[in-house]
Swiss-Prot record:
Pfam families: DUF150_C, RimP_N. One of its GO terms (biological process) is translation. It comes from the Bacteria. Belongs to the RimP family. Required for maturation of 30S ribosomal subunits. Its main location: cytoplasm. The keyword Disulfide bond does not apply. It is found in: Cytoplasm. Keywords: Cytoplasm, Ribosome biogenesis. This is Ribosome maturation factor RimP. One of its GO terms (cellular component) is cytosol.
Length: 147
């Protein structure tokens, strides 16, 4: 999971460039770890946008060095199916269906699909087969909008 300190470092740079920091993933794969940063803007993201942000973020990461060890940096659009990281993103997509993978089982399942009914504090509520299910954000490994 990405440290909040990294978000604090990245967000002002990305925002000043006219983009929204959608989220980050750090995938530790032995010697070949990956830091993936998702950016967005109202009219969409293209390759040139990713390259521009990559140059600025890479320079900042080289100076600040917030992540130990070697890793590759990838700048990407959230795309489809859009990953969800923060409570405000769940709030933005109230009424949409999502797929969720959890650390600990919820009603015996670690993979769930449902409609976002509410999102506040540290909890989201999904409508799964007409039953409301609360899920703590801290229990979510990954969540994506359904295509």
């Amino acid at each position: 999971m990405i440290n909040d300190d990294l978000i604090v470092l990245l967000e002002p740079i990305i925002k000043n460039m006219g983009y929204e920091l959608w989220g980050c993933e750090y995938l530790s794969q032995g010697k070949h770890s990956l830091l993936r940063i998702y950016i967005d803007k109202p009219d969409g993201i293209g390759i040139d946008d990713c390259q521009e942000v990559s140059k600025q973020v890479s320079a900042m990461l080289d100076v600040e060095d917030p992540i130990p060890g070697h890793y590759s940096l990838e700048i990407s659009s959230p795309g489809i199916p859009r990953p969800l990281f923060s409570i405000w993103q769940y709030q933005r997509y109230l009424g949409y269906e999502i797929h969720v993978k959890t650390f600990k089982p919820v009603n015996g399942k670690r993979k769930l699909s449902g409609i976002i009914v509410s999102a506040s504090g540290d909890t989201i509520v999904l409508d799964i087969n007409n039953e409301h299910q609360e899920i703590l954000l801290s229990n979510i490994v990954k969540a994506n909008l359904t295509v």
